[in-house]
A protein has these predicted regions:
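A detector for short, charged/polar N-terminal pre-domain segments
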Residues: 1-6
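Hydrophobic alpha-helical segments, especially transmembrane helices
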Residues: 16, 23, 34-35, 51
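Recognition helix of helix-turn-helix/homeodomain-like DNA-binding domains
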Residues: 30-44
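DNA major-groove recognition helix of helix-turn-helix/homeodomain DNA-binding modules
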Residues: 49-65
């Protein structure tokens, strides 16, 4: 994924496929509903800890891949 808009769209798609509302997701991840709204909108100024909580609740595995040659 290249930017936060893609991340936000992905999170929204997964959330909806699981039948979870933004409010339900925010409660399960212990973040504010506004955070979920802004995340799904692709807002750039996100707190990484909260992002990781949301991804965890949705069962999304975040992987970091080293560049070739490192």
């Amino acid at each position: 994924m290249k930017d936060m808009k893609e991340v936000g769209a992905f999170v929204a798609r997964v959330r909806k496929s699981q039948g979870i509302s933004q409010l339900e997701l925010s409660l399960a991840a212990d973040v504010g509903r506004r955070f979920v709204v802004e995340l799904e909108a692709g807002k750039e100024t996100l707190q990484s800890g909260k992002l990781l909580k949301v991804l965890s609740v949705l069962g999304i595995d975040l992987r970091l891949v080293e560049p070739k040659g490192v």
